[in-house]
Swiss-Prot record:
InterPro entries according to UniProt: MGF_505
Protein name listed in UniProt: Protein MGF 505-3R
Keyword Amino-acid biosynthesis included in the entry's annotation: no
Induction behaviour: Expressed in the early phase of the viral replicative cycle.
Family under the similarity heading: Belongs to the asfivirus MGF 505 family.
Covalent S-S links between cysteines: none
Species annotation: African swine fever virus (isolate Warthog/Namibia/Wart80/1980) (ASFV)
Pfam families named among the record's database cross-references: DUF249 (PF03158)
Keywords: Early protein
Top-rank lineage group of the source organism: Viruses
Described purpose of this protein according to its UniProt entry: Plays a role in virus cell tropism, and may be required for efficient virus replication in macrophages.
Amino acid sequence: MSSSLQELCRKKLPDCILPEFFDDYVLQLLGLHWQDHGSLQRIEKNQILVQQEPIHINEALKVAASEGNYEIVELLLSWEADPRYAVVGALESKYYDLVHKYYGQVKDCHDILPLIQNPETFEKCHELNSTCSLKCLFKHAVMNDMLPILEKYTDYLDRWEYCSQMLFELACRKKKYEMVVWIEGVLGVGKVTSLFTIAISNRDLQLYSLGFSIILEKLYSCGQDPTFLLNHFLRDVSIKGLLPFVLKTIEYGGSKEIAITLAKKYQHKHILKYFETWES
């Protein structure tokens, strides 16, 4: 069959119901047969049928690339599959010629990283950009919840205080709470209180509460009184009129009287009303 006729069939037939008399041999001639999987048919923009079973086109592309099946990869890309999945699949199975063939359609490895679950593949993907540093890898590991990457480089990070602090604050801003706990607990950071600044600025009550869980445990284990620290942050959130943060600080031991005094001074009526209702 001529290549032009095959291309025409590949473009037109997938949107139609395939005739029953199309056996594997005919489908192979048409380029619509996937070895070890079966017939291929495009049914929607993002969906195909593989041996009459529906599958997302990008998932199919990832599998085809992991098998090193250039023909099927090309077919699925012509059906508007996302080339990032071709790179991921090829990386997982170490088809590096295929990786470099399709990476050019993506250009930035950082656009691929969110699709990857395996830490080894994640690091390989990041290495596709030869200009990126380890610090860049660590930042994207935090943003994509790839804790095993940080665990692998624990000894390296343990000697790099600046980077640990930067990653800690990034995890706080991106609401990666598991990362926040791990970085502080394993690597240690010089300025834990930066967490509270970020939490208050971003109105992130969960991070704010997590910060107290972390820092109070440290203070109590050292036999230190946390009252000064609690009231320091209580003043900050009271001045800003952040009632949920005020209540959370009081819950951990902050002074209700300080909150009421500052609410009166800065005329935060919603805070005063809350405490009036509470007391009544």
